Amino acid sequence: SIINMDGSHKQEDLEVISTGSLGLDLALGVGGLPRGRVVEIFGPESSGKTTLCLESIAQCQKNGGVCAFIDAEHAFDPIYARKLGVKVEELYLSQPDTGEQALEICDTLVRSGGVDMVVVDSVAALVPKAEIEGEMGDSHVGLQARLMSQALRKLTGHIKRTNTLVVFINQIRMKIGVVYGSPETTTGGNALKFYASVRLDIRRAGQIKKGDEILGNETKVKVIKNKVAPPFRQAEFDILYGEGISWEGELIDIGVKHDIIDKSGAWYSYNDTK
């Protein structure tokens, strides 16, 4: 269909789903992850990628949304998800055998129009059928990249039409022989880099300790790409083991940054209350 942008078709406010982190919602510029778009979250191992997605699912469910989790890594922990506020009994969970099956399920969920958010964990685990049925040591050059490229070509139109948020979790690999620039790259070829409206780079910045006991990680997220607001903004928050994102700690940090809360040494004060 062809439309004339003469003002009769007003640009509606972008619908978003909160990430569960106030700082990251602000860094994204629109208040969360945009619906009707593809989002990629990537980073090293144990950096908080799945935790961030589960926090976002919990926020979506709080607002009455329907969510699906495609667990290609076969590592979904319902006990941990429940601790983060996810209503596991209301979550659609799939653990597919092949990459083709995972992406077909994703396409079916999106086309149904009955799901608000779909998470695919992870792109690296989307193994093509030919590779699974082949022998160990067989070479399958570019198979996964072609699979992702074909799937995203099919998906994007349906995603926009049904206003579904699709989040792909991705892992980092090292390029061999890179002298200048970063040797890091993400798996699954270049298609996802192009189709994603938002790309988030999540990293551990340090540890949170109480004596010798490690309670969690200081986490830094950089918005590498953003088609809906200015990119390259950053957010920092704490992820506590078994609890998820520390909302209270983040709120205090933002309050200090904007001179709403006074910090003096280890003391915080607000309106003469310490």
Swiss-Prot record:
GO biological process entries: DNA recombination; DNA repair; SOS response
Pfam family, one: RecA
Keyword ATP-binding carried by entry: yes
Alphabetized UniProt keyword annotations: ATP-binding, Cytoplasm, DNA damage, DNA recombination, DNA repair, DNA-binding, Nucleotide-binding, SOS response
SUPFAM superfamilies: P-loop containing nucleoside triphosphate hydrolases, RecA protein, C-terminal domain
Keyword RNA-binding: no
Protein name: Protein RecA
Source lineage: Bacteria, Pseudomonadati, Pseudomonadota, Betaproteobacteria, Neisseriales
